[in-house]
A protein has these predicted regions:
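Small/flexible residues
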Residues: 4, 117-119
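A short helix->loop->beta-strand "cap" motif at the edges of active sites that frequently abuts
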Residues: 44, 119-121
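Conserved N-terminal beta1-alpha1 strand-loop-helix module at the mouth
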Residues: 1-82
Length: 131
């Protein structure tokens, strides 16, 4: 399996699957296969951010897999949270942070960006601020 590049520049096509029925169950596999083919054919990096429970179905494909969200929690008794250190061990390449449907505080953003960088995970930071 090809390991996704850490140096993607500033261009990447990201498919955030949200929680739509069109990707439920094995349907996510079809999207991953198509994404892998398109990425290879057009030499464009593609990332898929499926609902967390579907991630294991697509980690075998040669695409970047992103968590839709991670939490600023520690490894241990944190049931129901997506912990960055566990995310890394689950063959996930990075995470979306601060999506408009899952906003977090500035303090959490700063902490998570630092943690993901330390873990060498991709960070897709979204903001509603226009610069």
């Amino acid at each position: 399996m090809r390991k996704p590049s850490n140096q993607l520049g500033n261009k990447m096509f990201i498919i955030n699957c949200k929680n739509y029925d069109e990707i439920a169950g094995d349907k996510i596999i079809k999207i991953a296969k198509i994404s892998e083919k398109v990425s290879r054919k057009y030499k464009v990096p593609i990332a898929i951010a499926p609902p967390h429970h579907l991630i294991p179905l697509i980690t075998k494909f040669k695409i970047t897999v992103l968590a839709q969200h991670v939490d600023d929690k520690k490894v241990g008794s944190t049931t129901g949270f997506m912990v960055p250190e566990i995310v890394k061990k689950s063959k996930i390449n990075g995470s979306i942070i601060n999506h408009s449907e899952h906003r977090i505080s500035e303090k959490e953003i700063i902490s998570l960006v630092k943690r993901l960088q330390k873990l060498k995970l991709k960070t897709v930071l979204l903001s509603h601020i226009h610069i």
